[in-house]
Regions:
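Minor-groove-contacting beta-hairpin "wing" of winged helix-turn-helix DNA-binding domains
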Residues: 62-68, 198-205
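A short, conserved structural fragment
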Residues: 51-62, 183, 187-199
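Short, amphipathic alpha-helical interaction segments positioned at domain boundaries
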Residues: 69-104, 206-216
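Short amphipathic alpha-helical interaction segments
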Residues: 37-52, 172-189
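Short, Lys/Arg-enriched N-terminal segment that forms or immediately precedes the first helix
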Residues: 1-9
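Short amphipathic alpha-helical interface segments
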Residues: 11-33, 85-177
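Charge-dense, extended regions
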Residues: 187-190, 194-197, 203-216
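N-terminal interaction modules that seed assembly of large macromolecular complexes
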Residues: 28-81
């Protein structure tokens, strides 16, 4: 099976995804066969777009895949659109590869340093912002955060989250009398935990000189 990571406007279309599966399983396909397989789709128009983008190859009235499959993870950049076969040798390397992201804000000098997988399925704030912005499917845990934050402005959220976290410069425990969605979000993300007394404690490494919080 072929997987598409970080799909574009074209490659996230349901028809394109189905077409990739179909062409991957059939050889020497002609346009009439594609139209018969997808009777409710504007095949001609969309096929021209895919051919123009270099994703589908047309030769002698036959159609085939022309996807630039990932062959190595050496120069792979986070958020890069890639096509990969699940049975390829590089697929396992892709799943095991990790990246580091940094979130900064305009209110203070705090930095949220987070470790993530390429698919951005790990529970981090950077991954949440990225997926919501691009309308990508959320994991179950990310949906839990969405129920609290929704489609929040990242700068707005970072302002309040980092301001809260920076209070740990002076205190080991923090009390929040009223409900605070940003404190709740930090709990879901794993930055803080609530002890038996209902007070919040820091649950990640904190470099006080660099004002950096490390979510691994």
């Amino acid at each position: 099976m072929i997987q598409i990571f970080n799909p574009s406007r074209l490659t996230r279309q349901p028809f394109f995804i189905d077409l990739v599966d179909y062409l991957d399983q059939h050889d020497d396909v002609i346009l009439r066969e594609i139209k018969a397989q997808f009777p409710d789709v504007a095949v001609d128009k969309l096929m021209e777009e895919y051919i123009k983008a270099g994703l589908i190859l047309r030769a002698n009235k036959r159609y085939s895949l022309n996807l630039p499959f990932l062959e190595s993870t050496d120069d792979l950049a986070l958020d890069q659109e890639i096509f990969i076969r699940e049975d390829s040798p590089v697929y396992q390397a892709l799943l095991e590869k990790t990246f580091e992201t940094e979130l900064r804000n305009q209110t203070n000098a705090a930095i949220l340093v987070e470790s993530t997988d390429f698919a951005r399925e790990k529970m981090t704030l950077s991954n949440y912002f990225y997926k919501v912005k691009n309308h990508y499917p959320l994991t179950e845990k990310q949906q839990e955060l969405y129920a609290i934050l929704g489609d929040v402005n990242p700068e707005y959220a970072l302002k309040y989250m980092t301001t809260f976290l920076l209070k740990f410069l002076k205190k080991d425990q923090l009390m929040q009398k009223r409900r605070d969605i940003f404190a709740e979000s930090l709990v879901v993300l794993g930055y803080i935990v609530q002890n038996e007394e209902g007070k919040y404690e820091l649950a990640v490494d904190f470099d006080k000189e660099r004002l950096s919080f490390y979510l691994s």
